């Protein structure tokens, strides 16, 4: 009889031969009513995470049945089982050997129990003998203590929970590595009540069972000061409030300072509703303690405020107190009334004035008027809230050199008096003026000189109106035709003059939006984004590339002229959907508000005769120090190299991480993060730029794959190169390359590796190597950004925090007396392998002391690279080899 193995796909040949050999010795003629099982499941006992296999074997006659697995009497529907069938004869009606295996991966408590095999033969059901799976090992933690902050001497609870088997599991708590009990308790103490701490401590718990001991993570409990108490007002001034408070306990850590915040009550309505933070930026002051008292200045008089205080120790700040409503008192007006006029008409003197332009510092209650003649005492009047008064002249006597002064007053007192305003001198024998308030006559009594003034004003206004209408009419013609056609006869011919320079397209923003054919909803959002094109004046070109140019410009605003950077695009928008996407993104970018993110000033369009839609023009703030890559490059390779300390480089990295953290919280993906797309403002802070609307204007760093648009392959993440998928994690990859650029002072990544070879180079596991003089911690952070799995890369929040901590740990930067760049390995350098300084480790450098003991080496470069030394006389350019750095402005073209 010939034996054959069925086609079982993945069944090993050795296993098949073993079954066939067993079948040759197996007894024949098994009774149908007898159990067909010839092998039953065994027992498995192990620790958590163990991998094991259960097996049962049966011999049947005829078509082999399907074997089911039971756990505690229940069929396992999703069991990881395999079934192998081996015939014992050539006929399908002969006996079969059936082997079923159940694989248990990563043993857990839920996998324990009684296991059996189940088969159905005809109308009978057969169940194998049981096998048992048990779990025994070290205790496993279900809950561990967590880090937290608590106020000094404030009770709190910690939780810890573990399980076996084997049971029981006893817990032992430790504080600062010292057990809180001499031995484990009689039962698991899952919750630990701590009555209070006066210093920062660490807590952990140990779980004990028959197999051994497992220790939980260590939780750090940071002790912060208690919330200050009894915040109250000590004294009030119109622009100052003096407040005091009682400090809370701070444990063994003395308070270093307290912070007081004040916010306007009118703008902080949410405060009264219990909001923990004010809706606007509060006015903040710090005070060294003791004493626990602070004078808060620069406030508005007669204004309600809410104030709160928090105190800080070396461990951190306390919680804020509840908001306390306070109000500054009224003050006197800061200035006198304006535009005082004093005129006489017959027997009446008219005095008129306007409200003070200076702040009133309270509620205006009225005005006081004082007048005095040369030989008469001063007369003081309370006018109330009126802004004019009539003095009736009557009686006998004489008055000369009469002057009038006016002052405003509030509940706090009188403000400053105005300068004396003289009345026309009265002739002797004329009546002496005595004051009385009279009602304004129903018909104003004007003298003849007033009529002349009124008539002259009407005539002047009419002339101005006629001239304006004429100029508007003439301007319409010039705008439409360039210049009015003026027929003049010269030698019998008609001459037409045309002035092109006086023809402008001054369409308003409304007209521009209407001409684009976009939706009304988008049009409404664009009111604050669009800028009239004629308000932008272009200057010199700052940079130009394949897709457009960046030019210096000026934006004419209502009351000033703003220096801006203007990006013009050579690629026009072809469809209305592209136009709406462009404008929608502009609306989104206009709302960005972060010190490390380049903000968008506005967008305008310039018409094109060859395109159906106008070309976009992006208006951005002008950055004094230009882009970060050029700054780094010139600091290393310029005519006068500049020393950049490590502290400044880490600050650049932290600024970029902060800006990208903000963009990622806005769910905004940059897609082109690099040093060339980061700008330096006048404060040497880095702003992330060239995202969204900014078409790329650089050439060398972009590689076109087929018809796909150019991509910056040396900065782009590996998954984006493969699938064109961009996420915030792909921006993290680009940030790591940008960190490498900063650490190398502007070198090009992967020198010697072509753009078309980058993907294969990365797929082989290659990454940028650690630059010279780069901190190990910084390079470790870069390497985390280049993890193959995007989920393993850090977030921008983690990157920012790590960089800020690194910056704090560095010593203060020190400027060297003189920085000299030299070639540290003269005479026969080693050829650089592909990716040198970014693909392979540089060769060993000789000791700088052996070359020149009087030089201060600022950087050590790989062999064969040219560097610059300060020189008072110009020297001829040296020939650059393949390993030498590119000239400024060319190094990007990898």
Swiss-Prot record:
GO molecular function, one term: virus receptor activity
Region annotation (Interaction with GAS6) ranges: 26-92
Keywords assigned by UniProt, alphabetized: ATP-binding, Cell membrane, Differentiation, Disulfide bond, Glycoprotein, Host cell receptor for virus entry, Host-virus interaction, Immunity, Immunoglobulin domain, Innate immunity, Kinase, Membrane, Nucleotide-binding, Oncogene, Phosphoprotein, Proto-oncogene, Receptor, Repeat, Signal, Transferase, Transmembrane, Transmembrane helix, Tyrosine-protein kinase, Ubl conjugation
Modified residues (Phosphotyrosine): 703, 779, 821, 866
GO biological process, one term: vascular endothelial growth factor receptor signaling pathway
Region of interest called Disordered, as start-end residue ranges on this chain: 823-853, 866-894
Record entry for activity regulation: Activated by GAS6-binding and subsequent autophosphorylation.
Pfam family, one: PK_Tyr_Ser-Thr
GO cellular component: actin cytoskeleton; cell surface; extracellular exosome; extracellular space; intracellular membrane-bounded organelle; plasma membrane; receptor complex
Disulphide-bridged cysteine pairs: 56-117, 160-205
Tissue expression: Highly expressed in metastatic colon tumors. Expressed in primary colon tumors. Weakly expressed in normal colon tissue.
Post-translational modification: Monoubiquitinated upon GAS6-binding. A very small proportion of the receptor could be subjected to polyubiquitination in a very transient fashion.
Residues that span the membrane, as ranges: 452-472
Glycosylation sites recorded in the entry for this protein: 43, 157, 198, 339, 345, 401
Chain positions found as Phosphoserine: 884
Alphabetized InterPro entries for the sequence: FN3_dom, FN3_sf, Ig-like_dom, Ig-like_dom_sf, Ig-like_fold, Ig_sub, Kinase-like_dom_sf, Prot_kinase_dom
Spans within the Cytoplasmic topological domain: 473-894
Lineage top rank: taxon: Eukaryota
Annotated membrane topology: Single-pass type I membrane protein
Binding residue positions for ATP: 542-550, 567
Subunit (UniProt): Heterodimer and heterotetramer with ligand GAS6. Interacts with CBL, GRB2, LCK, NCK2, PIK3R1, PIK3R2, PIK3R3, PLCG1, SOCS1 and TNS2. Part of a complex including AXL, TNK2 and GRB2, in which GRB2 promotes AXL recruitment by TNK2.
PANTHER family linked to this entry: TYROSINE-PROTEIN KINASE RECEPTOR (PTHR24416), TYROSINE-PROTEIN KINASE RECEPTOR UFO (PTHR24416:SF323)
Connected disease: AXL and its ligand GAS6 are highly expressed in thyroid carcinoma tissues, and might thus be involved in thyroid tumorigenesis. Overexpression of AXL and its ligand was also detected in many other cancers such as myeloproliferative disorders, prostatic carcinoma cells, or breast cancer.
Annotated protein name in UniProt: Tyrosine-protein kinase receptor UFO
Native source organism of the sequence: Homo sapiens
Organism lineage string: Eukaryota, Metazoa, Chordata, Craniata, Vertebrata
């Amino acid at each position: 009889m010939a034996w054959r193995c069925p086609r079982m796909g993945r069944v090993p040949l050795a296993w098949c031969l073993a079954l066939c050999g067993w079948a040759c010795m197996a007894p024949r003629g098994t009774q149908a009513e007898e159990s067909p099982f010839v092998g039953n499941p065994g027992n498995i006992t192990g620790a958590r995470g163990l991998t094991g296999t259960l097996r049962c074997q049966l011999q049947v006659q005829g078509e082999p049945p399907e074997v089911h697995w039971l756990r505690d009497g229940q069929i396992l529907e999703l069991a990881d089982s395999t079934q192998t069938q081996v015939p014992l004869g050539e006929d399908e009606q002969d006996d079969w050997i059936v082997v079923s295996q159940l694989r248990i991966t990563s043993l857990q408590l839920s996998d324990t129990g009684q296991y059996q095999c189940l088969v159905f033969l005809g109308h009978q059901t057969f169940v194998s003998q049981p096998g048992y799976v048990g779990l025994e090992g070290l205790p496993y933690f279900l809950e561990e203590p967590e880090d937290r902050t608590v106020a000094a001497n404030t009770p709190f609870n910690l939780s810890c929970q573990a399980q076996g088997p084997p049971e029981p599991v006893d817990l032992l708590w430790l504080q600062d590595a010292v057990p809180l009990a001499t031995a484990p308790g009689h039962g698991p103490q899952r919750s630990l009540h701590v009555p209070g701490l006066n210093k920062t401590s660490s807590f952990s718990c140990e779980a004990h069972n028959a197999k051994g001991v497992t220790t939980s993570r260590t939780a750090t409990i940071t002790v912060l000061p208690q919330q200050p108490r009894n915040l109250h007002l000590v004294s009030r001034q119109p622009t100052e409030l003096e407040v005091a408070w009682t400090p809370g306990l701070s444990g063994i850590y003395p308070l270093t300072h307290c912070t007081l915040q004040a916010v306007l009550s009118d703008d902080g309505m949410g405060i009264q509703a219990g909001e923990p933070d004010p809706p606007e930026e509060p006015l903040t002051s710090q005070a060294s303690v003791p004493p626990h008292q602070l004078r808060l200045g620069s406030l508005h008089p007669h204004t309600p405020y809410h104030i709160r205080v928090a105190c800080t120790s070396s461990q951190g700040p306390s919680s804020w107190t509840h908001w306390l409503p306070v109000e500054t008192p009224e003050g006197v007006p800061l200035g006198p009334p304006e535009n005082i006029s004093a005129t006489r008409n017959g027997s009446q003197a008219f005095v008129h004035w306007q409200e003070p332009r200076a702040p009133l510092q309270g509620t205006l209650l009225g005005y006081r008027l004082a007048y005095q003649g040369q030989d008469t005492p001063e007369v003081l009047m309370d006018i109330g809230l009126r802004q004019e008064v009539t003095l009736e002249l009557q009686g006998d006597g004489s008055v000369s050199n009469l002057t009038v002064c006016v002052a405003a007053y509030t509940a706090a007192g009188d403000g400053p008096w105005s300068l004396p305003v003289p009345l026309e001198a009265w002739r002797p024998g004329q009546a002496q003026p005595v004051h009385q308030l009279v009602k304004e006559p129903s018909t104003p009594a004007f003298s003849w000189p007033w009529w002349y003034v009124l008539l002259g004003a009407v005539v002047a206004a009419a002339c101005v109106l006629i001239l304006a209408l004429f100029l508007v009419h003439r301007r319409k013609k010039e705008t439409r035709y360039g210049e009015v056609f003026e027929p003049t006869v010269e030698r019998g011919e008609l001459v037409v003059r045309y002035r092109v320079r006086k023809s402008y397209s001054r369409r308003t923003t409304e007209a521009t939006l209407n001409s684009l054919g976009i939706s009304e909803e988008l049009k409404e959002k664009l009111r604050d984004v669009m800028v009239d094109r004629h308000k932008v004046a272009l200057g010199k070109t700052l940079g130009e590339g394949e897709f457009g140019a960046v030019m210096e410009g000026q934006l004419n605003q209502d009351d000033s002229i703003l220096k801006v950077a203007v990006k013009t695009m050579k690629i026009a928008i072809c469809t209305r959907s592209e136009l709406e996407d462009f404008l929608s993104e502009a609306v989104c970018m206009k709302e960005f508000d972060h010190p490390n993110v380049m903000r968008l000033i506005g967008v305008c369009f310039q018409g094109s005769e060859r395109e159906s839609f106008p070309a976009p023009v992006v208006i951005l703030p002008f950055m004094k120090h230009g882009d970060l890559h050029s700054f780094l490059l010139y600091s290393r390779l310029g005519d006068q190299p500049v020393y950049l300390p490590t502290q400044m480089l880490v600050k650049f990295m932290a600024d970029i991480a902060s800006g990208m953290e903000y963009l990622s919280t806005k769910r905004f993906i940059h897609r082109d993060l690099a040093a060339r797309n980061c700008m330096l403002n006048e404060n040497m802070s880095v702003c992330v730029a060239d995202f969204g609307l900014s078409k790329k204007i650089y050439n060398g760093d972009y590689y076109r794959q087929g018809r796909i648009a150019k991509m910056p392959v040396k900065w782009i993440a590996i998954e984006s190169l493969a699938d064109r998928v961009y996420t915030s994690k792909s921006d993290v990859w680009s940030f790591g390359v940008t960190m490498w650029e900063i650490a190398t002072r502007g070198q090009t990544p992967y020198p010697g590796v072509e753009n078309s070879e980058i993907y294969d180079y990365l797929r082989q596991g290659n990454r940028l190597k650690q630059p010279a003089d780069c901190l190990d911690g910084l390079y470790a952070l870069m390497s985390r950004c280049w993890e193959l799995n995007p989920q393993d890369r850090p977030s921008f929040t983690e990157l920012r925090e790590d960089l800020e901590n690194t910056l704090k740990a560095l010593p203060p930067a020190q400027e060297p007396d003189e920085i000299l760049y030299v070639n540290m390995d003269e005479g026969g350098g080693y050829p650089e392998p592909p990716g040198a300084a970014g693909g392979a480790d540089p060769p060993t450098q000789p000791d700088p002391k052996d070359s020149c003991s009087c030089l201060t080496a600022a950087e050590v470069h790989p062999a064969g690279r040219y560097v610059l030394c300060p020189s008072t006389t110009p020297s001829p350019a040296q020939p650059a080899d393949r390993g030498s750095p590119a000239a400024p402005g060319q190094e990007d073209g990898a």
